[in-house]
Amino acid sequence: MRRKLLTILFTLLAPFAAHAEWLIAECSAYTPYDCGTITATGETVHVGGVACNFLPFGTVVVIDGVEYIVNDRCGIDGCIDIFMESYEDAIQFGRQYKEVYIKR
């Protein structure tokens, strides 16, 4: 039930996400084995990068106290994909709803 409510809330707030300082986002993980090694910005994938469709490239986001930079795009609207080097770490992370702070 909580997950469904968060999904509805995020769907309603997604158009305004670029103007928010804090939001709750569905987060998942990806590896170079999933999508290749080059990001949408032309960089080589690296730890500290995230894929996100609703924030501009270069935006710094903080998730669980760790800073990440948006440097890629993902196939799921409203989701933030965190790059991880190992498949095992990505599987262990799974899909989670996280508080995300957008640094301006």
Task: Name the predicted role of every residue range.
Residues 1-4:
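Positively charged n-region of N-terminal signal peptides that target proteins for export
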Residues 7-15:
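Bacterial N-terminal signal peptides
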Residues 19-104:
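Solvent-exposed, well-ordered loop and adjacent helix/strand elements within mature globular domains
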